[in-house]
Amino acid sequence: MGSRRKQKTEKSMIQNLYWKQVFRSPKTKIGLMVVIIFALAAIFAPVLAPHDPLLVDVSIKLKNPSAAYPLGTDQLGRCILSRLLWGSRYSLSYSFTVLLITVCVGVPIVLFAGYVGGKIDSIIMRIIDVFMAMPVFIVALAIAGTVGASGAHLILSLSVVSWAEYARLARALTLQEKNKNYMTALKAGGCGHARIIFRHVLRNILPSVIALATMEIGSIILSIAGFSFIGLGVQAPTPEWGIMLSDSKSYIQTYPRLMFYPGILIMIIVLAFNYLGEGIQNGTDKK
């Protein structure tokens, strides 16, 4: 009983030390605060948005900021603030969907393959190499040309080419864990393979996977906005940041604020996720 209590205390101390290490940097705290603000804006967009983001009223197009329209209106008379708030919902939900698919596909496969080794591991690695060699633009173009451009198809494109990166990292970490002394002790103690993989190996590699995922969200947001900007992703009139940039590119000289608002939000959220990811990675490296 005393031994278990001591182990729990030691585990709690290690976890507390880890989180202190993660949030030691002011940049990490700032990144987390910004991410929380954007997440809340996305969740409560229907409540916070002063107008319908799809409502067109050309009689008030390109209106300057006012009490009714805090950031003004776009070229079709739509409320810019409302579209930005709803845009955060689309950008974050699409990004987290891609992330969830890639992690759930990439990590479990190589956990088993890396632990078992042999031919299975070799085959999985060759498959990973093939997917790592796929350029995301060509895949997105092929899918858009075959079944049409949409948000769902963009998620599919990004997931197809992104899962291999997580799989490769998870495999390398699994091989490291596999060769550690505690693995021999677990096997000698009669611990089953499934328990070793999911209770011990997965738990130990998870912080590094989370760190990569946090930093990759920024890249995914940029990809979604970029592909939507060139017409291979989310389609108009959806209030997505890349679409807003695309719609306003003709007004860059006369009404630069139309491009400034979505552009600055993309920059801020990408930096926030990068800062947060760096903090998690630093905590993982020093754990």
Per-region residue spans from a language model:
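Generic hydrophobic transmembrane alpha-helix motif, especially the helices
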Residues: 70, 74, 105, 114-177, ...
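Amphipathic cytosolic juxtamembrane alpha-helices at the membrane-cytosol interface
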Residues: 78-93, 117-125, 179, 184-211
